[in-house]
Swiss-Prot record:
GO CC, alphabetical: endoplasmic reticulum; endoplasmic reticulum membrane; mitochondrial outer membrane; mitochondrion; peroxisomal membrane
Compartment list: Mitochondrion outer membrane; Peroxisome membrane; Microsome membrane; Endoplasmic reticulum membrane
Modified residues (Phosphoserine): 621
Keywords of the record: Acetylation, ATP-binding, Endoplasmic reticulum, Fatty acid metabolism, Glycoprotein, Ligase, Lipid metabolism, Magnesium, Membrane, Microsome, Mitochondrion, Mitochondrion outer membrane, Nitration, Nucleotide-binding, Peroxisome, Phosphoprotein, Signal-anchor, Transmembrane, Transmembrane helix
Organism: Mus musculus
Glycosylation sites: 136
InterPro entries: AMP-binding_CS, AMP-dep_synth/lig_dom, ANL_N_sf, LC-FACS_euk
Record's protein name: Long-chain-fatty-acid--CoA ligase 1
One Pfam short name: AMP-binding
Chain positions with Phosphotyrosine modification: 85
Length: 699
């Protein structure tokens, strides 16, 4: 065959040939082709698309050039220069709110509700008006519009908190939050340390608590209490007797309204908040947080997530995490500078699910304890093996999409399995963020699949204004806390006594950036412990760099102790492993320098224990099971199994446990207000059980 004949043999058909061929096809065949083409086009147009990651997710942080101590920065940044501000016109909390007024076009700002009622909203300009009235009222009462003027704020989350806070910021005053879970002694300490002469309280009961301090001559500096709710004349008289003026928030507003003072906004370097952190030992420490600290941390979040999320006036935040902590403060700052709405819960955590259904938030910040409850409740309702299998199967299918970067809530599995879960949160959540404590990878991964929204995990502490690391859009894997935020550097330093070496990519997490605090109020000794001479914040957490440039928190430097044979023990690491047991709600691992082994006090999970025990042929009430020696042995065996799977060394495993039926709590003095274990108090509380275990266990 000639070459030209070969070409002619393989030539593409002419268009006229195709037309003639199509004309010969039956109508049904043509309709089938058309339907197939339409379906293909529809699939292509509506197929789930992966979120665009802001950088190469296989290398989310990079080492700073020319350094020898392993300093790393976010790969989101174009160079080694850290982000300071995201918006040029937002450099203080005051600026952020003013931007919110503009971009919202004076839209709704703060919302609250009464029982069984819808949310009622006040606009951005109404908030600004009330804030200026309150600030002017304070000035009329003799308070100075400067960053040396501290104003106490003792309240649950509610619109008045933001209004009072903005009133302070409008005149460069500094907010000092108080919260009742601190306890009376700690509140007295803070009032004196910050020399608070005026405190805003939401309820008369809190005003009475404050008055007790003055009456007992413990807080002589306190002169004015402003109360948000209504109160009786007896409280006014009681205040007069000890030299404290009791005034309503409305009266202070009215005073400022007729004595208006032009705002005196703060500078970025001015103090904004003195956030007292509850330590596990000693008095609270007052972290001095500037406007720049807060705006810088907000800017870091916005920059890290901008490829997939930018808050807008359509967004609604549910405010229930304490505003006395920096996590919620930073989240609300991000919302306000974008003109979004903030709806407050009714003040009762038991009504939160009802508030969520009514408010239908799009932004939902959470803490691990709430996530664990959600996870347990979901699987608790899946009371048959078939239901559990379906949940697990659907979750695995959506987890495969997550690994491809796809986040959605409209898949077949969402419609069949997860719709009710999503509806329980209002049905419109598009972003969740968790922080403040470690969260189980199992829990986080499942809820990411079930809730079908962008779900970020952050890491930080009060001293770096809430966050210093954050997971990035597109990386929905669990088991790490993300990469350094674009506003700060992170490095690891050696902790030789625990065998963590920076050269091996492990060590104490240290942070440096414009989000790092200025020190502790009137406490140079503890400031020097936290901040070194080069401005690095030493967190006390042990981290490990993963191959993709993310950070994994693996241990805690504090609370380490030696056993008799000289081995170092980090009890919190062991506790976090043991908490993976289905039967366990809380665990306290204890060791002593004169003893060669560890023991633990375990509080079983009141909801999970009965079914867990039944699978092992054991029955009884919760209290009976807690006293059952067979349950004790079964729980111990489960803990040891988990420890072995997690790679604990033999000396890191407990040799015996005491089962205790009552949860460690703030009320019984065994947890701090931020739900961290008070180890000295736990040691004293369980001294008899500890002594008995050491006396009876022979190794």
């Amino acid at each position: 065959m000639e070459v030209h004949e070969l070409f002619r043999y393989f030539r593409m058909p002419e268009l006229i040939d195709i037309r003639q061929y199509v004309r010969t096809l039956p109508t049904n065949t043509l309709m089938g082709f058309g339907a197939f083409a339409a379906l293909t086009t529809f699939w292509y147009a509506t197929r789930p698309k992966a979120l665009k990651p802001p950088c190469d997710l296989s290398m989310q942080s990079v080492e700073i050039a020319g350094t020898t101590d392993g300093i790393r920065r976010s790969a989101v940044l174009e160079d080694d220069k850290l982000l300071v501000y995201y918006y040029d016109d937002v450099r203080t909390m005051y600026d952020g709110f003013q931007r919110g007024i503009q971009v919202s076009n004076n839209g709704p700002c703060l919302g609250s509700r009464k029982p069984n009622q819808p949310y009622e909203w006040i606009s951005y300009k109404e908030v600004a008006e009330l804030a200026e009235c309150i600030g002017s009222g304070l000035i009329q009462k003799g308070f100075k519009p400067c960053s040396e003027q501290f104003i106490g704020l003792f309240s649950q989350n509610r619109p008045e908190w933001v209004i009072v806070e903005q009133g302070c910021f409008s005149y460069s005053m500094v907010v000092v939050p108080l919260y009742d879970t601190l306890g009376a002694d700690a509140i007295t300490y803070i009032v004196n340390k910050a020399e608070l002469s005026v405190i805003f309280a939401d309820k008369p009961e809190k005003a009475k608590l404050l008055l007790e301090g003055v009456e007992n001559k413990l807080t002589p500096c306190l002169k004015i209490i402003v109360i948000m709710d209504s109160y009786g004349s007896d409280l006014v008289e009681r205040g007069k007797k000890c030299g404290v003026e009791i005034i309503s928030l409305k009266a202070l507003e009215d005073l400022g309204r007729v004595n208006r003072v032009k705002p005196k906004p703060p500078e970025p370097e001015d103090l904004a908040i003195i956030c007292f952190t509850s330590g596990t030992t000693g008095n609270p420490k007052g972290a001095m947080i500037t406007h720049q600290n807060i705006i810088n941390d907000c800017s870091g979040f916005i920059k890290a997530t901008e490829s997939a999320f930018i808050a807008s006036t359509d967004d609604v935040l549910i405010s229930f995490l304490p505003l006395a902590h920096m996590f919620e403060t930073v989240v609300e700052c991000v919302m306000l500078c974008h003109g979004a709405k903030i709806g407050f819960f009714q003040g009762d955590i038991r009504l939160l699910m009802d508030d969520l259904k009514v408010l239908q938030p799009t932004i939902f910040p959470v803490v691990p304890r709430l996530l664990n409850r959600m996870f347990d409740r979901i699987f608790g309702q899946a009371n048959t093996s078939l239901k559990r299998w379906l949940l697990d199967f659907a979750s695995k299918r959506k987890e495969a999409e997550l690994r491809s970067g796809i986040v959605r809530n409209n898949s077949l599995w969402d419609k069949l399995i997860f719709h009710k879960i999503q509806s329980s949160l209002g049905g419109k959540v598009r972003l969740m963020i968790t922080g403040a404590a470690p969260v189980s990878a199992t829990v986080l991964t499942f809820l990411r699949t079930a809730l079908g929204c962008q779900f970020y995990e952050g890491y930080g502490q009060t001293e770096c204004t809430a966050g210093c690391c954050l997971s990035l859009p597109g990386d929905w894997t669990a088991g790490h806390v993300g990469a350094p935020m674009p506003c700060n550097y992170v490095k690891l330093v050696d902790v030789e006594e625990m065998n963590y070496l920076a050269s091996k990519g492990e060590g104490e997490v240290c942070v440096k950036g414009a989000n790092v605090f200025k020190g502790y109020l009137k406490d140079p000794a503890r400031t020097a412990e936290a901040l070194d001479k080069d401005g690095w914040l030493h967190t006390g957490d042990i981290g490990k760099w993963l191959p993709n440039g993310t950070l994994k928190i693996i241990d805690r430097k504090k609370h380490i102790f030696k056993l008799a044979q000289g081995e170092y023990i980090a009890p919190e690491k062991i506790e976090n492993i043991y908490l993976r047991s289905e039967a366990v709600a809380q665990v306290f691992v204890h060791g002593e320098s004169l003893q060669a082994f560890l023991i633990a006090v375990v509080v079983p999970d009141v909801e999970s224990l009965p079914s867990w025990a039944q699978k092992r042929g054991l029955q009884g009430s919760f209290e009976e099971l807690c006293r059952n020696k067979d349950i004790n042995k079964a729980i111990l065996d489960d803990l040891l199994k988990l420890g072995k799977e997690a790679g604990l060394k033999p000396f890191e495993q407990v040799k015996g446990i005491a089962v205790h039926p009552e949860l460690f709590s703030i009320d019984n003095g065994l947890l701090t207000p931020t739900l961290k274990a008070k180890r000295p108090e736990l040691r004293n509380y369980f001294r008899s059980q500890i002594d008995e275990l050491y006396a009876t266990i022979k190794i």
